[in-house]
């Protein structure tokens, strides 16, 4: 799947980010826990060199718990403080503030030695489009502090948001690279919904999810969709046959009982994104 989604304002955002980084102590990066590496901009490590770092694994309640633990260890070894974000937990703000203290411990101690007490940490929130940066800030601020939306790239200008006496955030639009050199990265982002569905082939996404699920989470996928059919003819594709079975189960049929692949593909993709299949991660450190 060749995907290129890079609006002009993103180029400006990258330049602005380089300038804004001079103002902050901490870079707070958001990524989807189901595809943490695919959901990171490859330039961030270079741009944020010398800054304290945090990474928030969003939607961790939808990801494989063991994979998430492995990712947290992976990022710790890189000097990045990882925080697992679970939509079901209510202590969100405390988890973030506690994590900031850990990530910025050196700066806080350095300020204390200079006699500077309680100076707020200034942080920048970064991430690819549609990862939920504005919602993240709103949850911290306890009010609608930044414009939010459910489509990639809705946030535009930069805003300073005062969270409390100890933390101020700069909401910066996410940056997605101009093209995906590795098609697998684009597919993972498409699966988790980080790219606008309008530019995607939903049948490819559903096919990939079923193929990946069969290989890595067969029990979960078969519990949801029934057993993978065994082709009578070696020329038949078992994943396509599986999609046809699912379509019949769900009533995703056109006139003449023909399979409506678009409709069933949308349902399979939505099942994954909403967690109805179960806890599934699309990559783990050993795979990348």
PLM features per residue range, with description:
Residues 1-26, 34-43, 47-53, 60, ...:
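Helix-rich effector regions associated with P-loop NTPase G domains
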Residues 95, 99, 135, 208, ...:
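Alpha-helical scaffold segments in soluble metabolic enzymes
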Residues 92, 132, 168:
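Short phosphate-engaging motifs
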Residues 116-118, 140, 161-162:
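Solvent-exposed alpha-helices and their adjacent loops that cap or buttress functional pockets
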């Amino acid at each position: 799947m060749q995907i290129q989604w890079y609006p002009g304002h993103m180029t400006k955002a990258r330049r602005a980010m380089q300038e804004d980084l001079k103002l902050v102590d901490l870079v707070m990066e958001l990524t989807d826990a189901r595809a943490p590496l695919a959901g990171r901009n490859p330039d961030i490590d270079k741009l944020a060199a010398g800054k304290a770092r945090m990474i928030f694994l969003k939607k961790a309640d939808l990801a494989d718990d063991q994979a998430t633990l492995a990712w947290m260890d992976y990022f710790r070894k890189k000097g990045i403080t990882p925080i697992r974000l679970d939509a079901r937990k209510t202590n969100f703000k405390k988890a973030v503030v506690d994590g900031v203290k850990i990530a910025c411990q050196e700066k806080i101690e350095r300020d204390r030695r200079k006699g500077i007490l309680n100076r707020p940490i200034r942080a920048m929130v970064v991430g690819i489009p549609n990862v939920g940066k504005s919602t993240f800030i709103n949850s911290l601020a306890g009010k609608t502090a930044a414009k939010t939306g459910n489509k990639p790239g809705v946030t535009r200008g930069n805003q300073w948001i005062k969270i409390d006496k100890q933390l101020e955030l700069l909401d910066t639009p996410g940056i997605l690279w101009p093209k995906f050199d590795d098609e697998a990265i684009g597919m993972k982002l498409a699966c988790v919904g980080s790219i606008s569905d309008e530019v995607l082939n939903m049948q490819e996404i559903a096919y990939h999810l079923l193929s990946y699920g069969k290989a890595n989470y067969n029990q979960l996928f078969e519990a949801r969709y029934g057993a993978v059919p065994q082709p009578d003819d070696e020329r038949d594709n078992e994943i396509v046959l599986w999609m046809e079975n699912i379509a019949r189960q769900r009533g995703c049929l056109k006139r003449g009982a023909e399979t409506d692949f678009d409709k069933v593909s949308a349902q399979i993709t939505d099942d994954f994104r909403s967690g109805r299949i179960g806890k599934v991660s699309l990559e783990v450190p050993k795979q990348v």
